[in-house]
């Protein structure tokens, strides 16, 4: 039990790095790989590899390609992972690769353990461990299930932070649009129609002539957006003005106005 305690304490140190920074999934994989002498993978619900560590001497080009190059597991394999809502310990590969398209596996003694990552009663991903010729003990499983709980909490926090960030960005855009006069709003709509994307070159005089407004209206509208931090602009002299959208919610909100 003392060995389990020491391993758990090492895991806790990752959490105690700082109370404000998110726990790196890669750090958890590295620790699990080191203390359990195994490969460790953290995969999102959609099969994206969020963190991984291979044990020393691990040789499997198929797995390395999926993890390092593709950074994603095949959809059929990920669906198989999601079918399990409880820990599946010590699964023998029986000479078959986990990826159906590969077929036979060169190693015959691979043992895997699959741990669902759950938060707020929702499946968020999967923690996968694999090693060769040695089953995972009960102490090992206690540690990895504890790790999966931590990962689930971090995934939830990341989702909540992303939601808060998206809400904030949307509010900033709505406030910026609210400061525009009717003619400035009309100018802005035509500006971003001309850009046809998140960045590009704008010739204010051409838009002014096309829409039938003064150039100053366009300049004022751009200044308001730049002050709000939703765009950045840079004068290129006679060529026009280079504009880049900084807040991705801007184009969505302008579409709603139309």
From Swiss-Prot:
Presence of the UniProt keyword DNA-binding in the record:
yes
Q: Which NCBIfam families match?
A: codY_Gpos, PRK04158.1
Span list, region GAF domain:
1-156
Single GO term (MF): DNA-binding transcription factor activity
Keywords tagged on the record: Cytoplasm, DNA-binding, Repressor, Transcription, Transcription regulation
Name of the molecule in the record: Global transcriptional regulator CodY
Give the source lineage, highest ranks first.
Bacteria, Bacillati, Bacillota, Clostridia, Eubacteriales
Could you tell me which residues form the DNA-binding region?
Answer: 204-223
PANTHER family xrefs? GLOBAL TRANSCRIPTIONAL REGULATOR CODY, GTP-SENSING TRANSCRIPTIONAL PLEIOTROPIC REPRESSOR CODY
Indicate whether Repressor appears among the record's keywords. Answer: yes
Q: Which Pfam families match?
A: CodY, HTH_CodY
What organism does the record attribute this protein to? Clostridium botulinum (strain Eklund 17B / Type B)
Q: Where does the record say this protein resides?
A: Cytoplasm
Q: What is the annotated role of this protein in its UniProt record?
A: DNA-binding global transcriptional regulator which is involved in the adaptive response to starvation and acts by directly or indirectly controlling the expression of numerous genes in response to nutrient availability. During rapid exponential growth, CodY is highly active and represses genes whose products allow adaptation to nutrient depletion.
Q: Which SUPFAM superfamilies match?
A: Winged helix' DNA-binding domain
Q: Name one GO cellular component term.
A: cytoplasm
* Family matches, as HAMAP family: HTH_type_CodY (MF_00621)
Gene Ontology biological-process annotations: negative regulation of DNA-templated transcription
Concerning its family, UniProt says: Belongs to the CodY family.
Cited InterPro entries: CodY, GAF-like_dom_sf, GTP_trans_reg_CodY_C, Transc_reg_CodY_N, WH-like_DNA-bd_sf, WH_DNA-bd_sf
């Amino acid at each position: 039990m003392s060995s389990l305690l020491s391993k758990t304490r090492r895991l806790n140190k990752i959490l105690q790095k700082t109370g404000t920074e998110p726990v790196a999934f890669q750090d958890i994989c590295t620790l699990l790989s080191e203390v359990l002498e195994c490969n460790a993978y953290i995969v999102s619900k959609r099969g994206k590899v969020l963190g991984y560590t291979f044990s020393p001497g691990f040789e499997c080009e198929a797995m390395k390609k999926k993890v390092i190059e593709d950074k994603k597991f095949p959809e059929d394999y990920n669906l198989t992972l999601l079918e399990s809502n409880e820990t599946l310990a010590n699964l023998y590969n029986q000479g078959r690769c986990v990826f159906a398209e590969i077929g036979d596996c060169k190693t015959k003694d691979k043992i895997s353990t699959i741990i669902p990552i759950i938060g707020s009663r929702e499946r968020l991903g999967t923690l996968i461990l694999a090693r060769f010729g040695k089953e995972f003990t009960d102490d090992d499983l206690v540690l990895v299930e504890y790790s999966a709980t931590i990962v689930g909490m971090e995934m939830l926090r990341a989702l909540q932070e992303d939601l808060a960030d998206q809400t904030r960005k949307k509010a900033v855009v709505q406030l910026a649009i609210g400061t525009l006069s009717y003619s400035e709003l009309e100018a802005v709509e035509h500006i971003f129609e001309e850009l046809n994307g998140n960045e590009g070159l704008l010739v204010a005089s051409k838009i002014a002539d096309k829409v039938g407004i003064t150039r100053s209206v366009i300049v004022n509208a751009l200044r308001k957006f730049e002050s709000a931090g939703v765009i950045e602009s840079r004068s290129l002299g006679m060529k026009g003005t280079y504009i880049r959208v900084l807040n991705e919610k801007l184009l969505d909100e302008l579409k709603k106005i139309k």
